[in-house]
Each structure stands twice: as C-alpha cells, then as structure tokens.
Design a protein with these regions (language model features):
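Zinc-dependent deaminase catalytic domain
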Residues: 1-221
Length: 221
C-alpha cells in the first residue's frame, strides 16, 4: 500500500478502468492512499482473458478492439479450469470496503512516515457516491470486514466505521480527541439517493475539476 503526499500525486498514479470506483483517503492532508473496487473472481478472469486477447492482437498488428469472442471464451474456460480465478477475490468488493479492510495497514504506513504525529483530519474522495440499501441500484450486502459488523450499503458502512468513530479502536493513541471528517464524491452513483450533509456531500466545483481532469479523462476501456 503506497503512501502519496498530495491528492494530485495520488490521482496521477492511477488510470481508472471503465466502471471502476476509486476511493482516496487523506490523513492531515499529508498522506494519501488509493483504493479500487474490484469485480468477483469470474468477471476478473474473463477481463484478464480479454486483455490477453487484446495483447495478442496488438502483437499481430491487428485491431485490439476486435477480439475473437469464441477464442476468448475458450481461453476463459482454460483459465477457469487452471485455477486462475482463485488468484482473485471471490466476491466483488467496493472501493469503500477495501478502504475499511486495509485501514490498519495505512495507519501503520502513516505512523512510519510521520512518527509522533496525531491524525486530526480525515478526508475521503470518491469517484462515485456510495451505494445504499435504500436506493434503486445494486448495493453491497457484505457485512463482516476486519472483525467489524457493518450494515448493508457503503453509505451505512462509512457512517458506522467513520462517523461513529469505530475506526479509532484500531489505534486510539494515533487520533486526536476530535477528528475533522469529510467525504466528497464526484459523480452520483444512484440518482434516487441524495447526499446533502456534512458527512457525505458532492465535491465542490474546484475539486470536481481536479477529479475529472485526473481520473475521468484517463479512463481505460
């Protein structure tokens, strides 16, 4: 898990894939960590099969977008039978969940980089607003992450973990008594859910420009 020293540095290090969600967390505006969403094992395997076929086309000086569907399916079946799918997480994981899952690790990174410094500000930047069990789109029902029991929907997970300060239990001495916390999102994932509060809110125009220029303009299809 790499530590970046600015938002622009963190954004520049990643090329977002199509339909991929990124979550960037900042401690004190000094340390930034990036987390990606990932599909389930089967989808990850077929995506890798597609990528291999595209590379093969490129080496033969053929159109990388015109992948032979039959050959790709045969390669996918071979990869599945060879156990390639076992290399990937079996279930789809949202970026917010991966952030919570790796929270203990990034605290260790922060302490190593900034010894004797307490965390007083946490900001999270999302490419898309969190999924919600109250919305019309699919949401994550995964409830157990790092021995924490968290409710369905990433909006409730973030609230339970951060707003209720359960994150402090991982290393109580590392945080100030009062920590400023804010979550910004760039795009609205589910139009049926509106976030307009001090905890989760749409990014302001300047921040949206930074996120769009850095992440949306370089989406890898």
């Amino acid at each position: 898990m790499k530590l970046y020293h600015s938002l622009s540095e963190a954004i520049a290090a990643f090329q977002r894939k199509s339909r991929e969600v990124l979550a960037i967390i900042s401690f004190n505006g000094q340390a930034y960590f990036v987390f990606r969403s990932n599909p389930n094992a089967q989808i990850s395997t077929i995506m890798q099969a597609h990528a291999k076929m595209a590379i093969g086309n490129e080496l033969r000086h053929c159109d990388t977008k015109k992948v032979d569907v039959v050959r790709k399916q045969k390669l996918y079946n071979f990869m599945m039978n060879s156990g390639v799918s076992q290399q990937f997480p079996q279930n789809a994981q949202h970026a917010e969940e991966n952030l919570i899952r790796n929270f203990p690790n990034i605290l260790k990174k922060f302490k190593a980089e900034f010894p004797n410094q307490k965390i007083n500000t946490i900001e999270i930047f999302l490419t898309h607003s969190p999924c919600s069990s109250k919305g019309k789109k699919k949401y994550s029902a995964q409830c157990h992450i790092n021995n924490f029991f968290l409710p369905p929907g990433c909006d409730k997970k973030l609230a339970a973990f951060f707003k209720k300060e359960n994150y402090k239990s991982i290393d109580k001495q590392l945080f100030d008594k009062k920590v400023k916390l804010r979550i910004h999102y760039n795009h609205q994932f589910d139009p049926s859910i509106e976030y307009n509060n001090h905890f989760i809110r749409e990014a302001d125009p300047i921040l949206k420009t930074v996120l769009c220029d850095g992440l949306d303009s370089r989406v890898k299809h």
